[in-house]
Amino acid sequence: MTDLSDFVANAQKEIKNAQNTEALDLIRVSYFGKKGHFSTHMASLSQLSVEDRPAAGRVINQAKKQIQQWLDTRKKTLQSELLARRLSSEIIDVSLPGRRLQHGGLHPVTLTIQRIECFFKKWGFSVESGPEIEDSEHNFDALNIPSHHPARTEQDTFWFDSERLLRTQTSGVQIRTMKKKGPPLRVIAPGRVYRHDYDQTHTPMFHQMEGLILDSDISFANLKNTLQCFLQYFFQKELPTRFRPSYFPFTEPSAEVDVMTQNGEWLEVLGCGMVHPNILTHLNIDPEHYSGFAFGMGIERLAMIAYGVTDLRAFFENDVRFLKQFK
C-alpha cells in the first residue's frame, strides 16, 4: 500500500504523452477527481491499522504533490507551444496602411448654442441654467400666465402632477436669477424644453435660448439694437429684419422678429418684448425704477436656417451621414 512508485511512474508517462490541454485535463480528473485514483487510495486507508495510516497517508500526499507539479509544468509547456504555433501562423504585414481614425465633431445644436453664447458673452451677459422639472410658479405664475391660458393644458404641457411639469420654456431660469441676484443684470438661459408637439418642424423636446436685461432706463430701442446686432453676427451678414407686434403674457409691448430669406420671404426667428411690470411687481422689483427686455429663440430653428436643414427631426436621429457634415 505504501509503495506507489509504479503508480507515480505511470502518471508521469501519461502526463508526458498528453498532446494538448484537453487531454491533460482528462488525466487530471482521472487522478484528482471525486472518483479518481487518489480518492480510491485515500478510501483504502481505513483498511490499514492505526499505526500504519500516518505513513501511508504521507506517501499518498507526496505522490499527489509530485503529480500535480508535473501537471502544472506540462500545462505551461503545452500553452507555450500553442502560442508559438499561433504566432507563426499569424503573419502581420507591417507594410499595410493603418486604419484612419474617425474623428468626432460637435453636434449642430451644440455649435449653434456656442455661437449664440459667444455673442452675448461679449455683450456682458452671463449664462445661467435651471431645473428641467419645473413648478407652475416659475413656469407660469411668475411669468404672468393666467390659470386659464391654453399653454397650461395637458395638450401642450407634460405634467407630472398638479404642480410639477417638464418646463415649456427657459423663462423660469430668468425668474430664479432675478430672485437670487436682483437688478441690474444681463443673463441668457440656454436649455432643453418640452411641449406636446411632433411633426416636420416641431419635436416634443427642443432647445431654447432666452435672454433678459434688467436695469434702469432700458427701452425698446435697446432691445431692437441688441437683436439686430445679434442677427447680423449670427448670419454673418446684414439681413433685412422687421419687428411685428405680437402678444406674450410676460412682455408688454411684445414683438416677433422676422428676417428676409434669399428667396425674398419673411421668416420668424425669435420673440421679444419689454418685461411686463406685473412680473417685476411679483418679484418685489420696483417697475417705476427698473425696466428691461426679454427675448427667446429656438436653437433648432436658427440651426435649420444657418445650415439649410429642412427637417427638424434630422437633429435627433443621430444619422452619422448627417452629423459628419458639421465637423
Curated annotation (Swiss-Prot):
Keyword field: Aminoacyl-tRNA synthetase, ATP-binding, Cytoplasm, Ligase, Magnesium, Metal-binding, Nucleotide-binding, Protein biosynthesis
Coiled-coil segments: none
Transcription keyword on record: no
PROSITE patterns tied to this protein: AA_TRNA_LIGASE_II (PS50862)
Any single GO BP term: phenylalanyl-tRNA aminoacylation
Cofactor binding remark: Binds 2 magnesium ions per tetramer.
CDD domains: PheRS_alpha_core
Highest taxon of the lineage: Bacteria
Coarse class of the protein's main subcellular location: cytoplasm
EC number: 6.1.1.20
Location of the protein in the cell: Cytoplasm
Keyword rRNA processing on entry: no
GO cellular component labels: cytoplasm
Gene3D superfamilies: Bira Bifunctional Protein, Domain 2 (3.30.930.10)
Binding site for Mg(2+): E252
Enzymatic reactions: tRNA(Phe) + L-phenylalanine + ATP = L-phenylalanyl-tRNA(Phe) + AMP + diphosphate + H(+)
Single GO term (MF): tRNA binding
InterPro entries in alphabetical order: aa-tRNA-synth_II, aa-tRNA-synth_II/BPL/LPL, Phe-tRNA-synth_IIc_asu, Phe-tRNA_ligase_II_N, Phe_tRNA_ligase_alpha1_bac, Phenylalanyl-tRNA_Synthase, tRNA-bd_arm
Cofactor(s) the record lists: Mg(2+)
NCBIfam families (alphabetical): pheS (TIGR00468)
Family per record: Belongs to the class-II aminoacyl-tRNA synthetase family. Phe-tRNA synthetase alpha subunit type 1 subfamily.
Subunit record text: Tetramer of two alpha and two beta subunits.
Name of the protein in its database record: Phenylalanine--tRNA ligase alpha subunit
Organism expressing this protein natively: Hamiltonella defensa subsp. Acyrthosiphon pisum (strain 5AT)
Taxonomic lineage of the native organism: Bacteria, Pseudomonadati, Pseudomonadota, Gammaproteobacteria, Enterobacterales
